[in-house]
Structure formats: structure tokens, C-alpha cells
Amino acid sequence: MVDGYDQYVVTMDDGTTYEAEFVGNDASSDLAVIKLKDADASKLTPIEIGDSSKLNVGEWVMAIGSPFGNEQSVSTGIVSALYRSTAMSSTSGNTIYANMIQTDAAINPGNSGGALVNDNGELVGINSL
């Protein structure tokens, strides 16, 4: 998670950087929201959202993230299973995660919260350990 830092910098694939501010997070879904400062929206391209319900076991996917601090890394794999669920225990109780996509693409610390995309580059999931 990104909460608790004093400064946030977002680097685009062309090397352009933007300062950002923390808006909020949801630890249970492994997501944070940040807001870019002084960004020209006309120069930003949002990711296309795919339909994860149309995924098939055996379909190629890519996990995007910064594993072990290695920025803008991509690993590939296939959809191994769909609609997986698991329970995680913590000091605050149990949390059940359902409808997960299982992939054999390498997911390492730093990939959490990153995009899982299909072979069209559409977002179909969020990586989590």
C-alpha cells in the first residue's frame, strides 16, 4: 500500500513524471487511489476495462507491476482457474476473497494492486498475493 508516504511520483511509460497525492485505500482489495497533480488529462490514456466473465481457462494474461521495486515489469501466463475463493486469517478476523482469477503469471511483492490484462491489453483483474 502507498499510505503513509510524504511524496508520490507517478512515471508514465514515456518517462513523463507527475507528482501525486494520496486519496485513500482499501486494504481488503489491495487498492489505493491517488490523484495526479498538474496533469493534462488530454495526454493521459485510461486503461480499457475488459470483461473478466468472458475469460477462459488457458487464455493468456499479463501481470503488470513493480515486483521487488523493478518498475514497469510484465510477466505472462495463462488463466489457470476461475472463480477461486480463499479465506485469510488476521488479528481482526477472517476475510473471504471470492471470484478470484488464478494465473501462473509470476506475482511477487510489488505486483499487488497492479493490472492483470488480457491479450488485448484490457484490464480483467487486479494482482494480489
Residue ranges of predicted features:
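Serine-dependent protease modules
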Residues: M1-L129
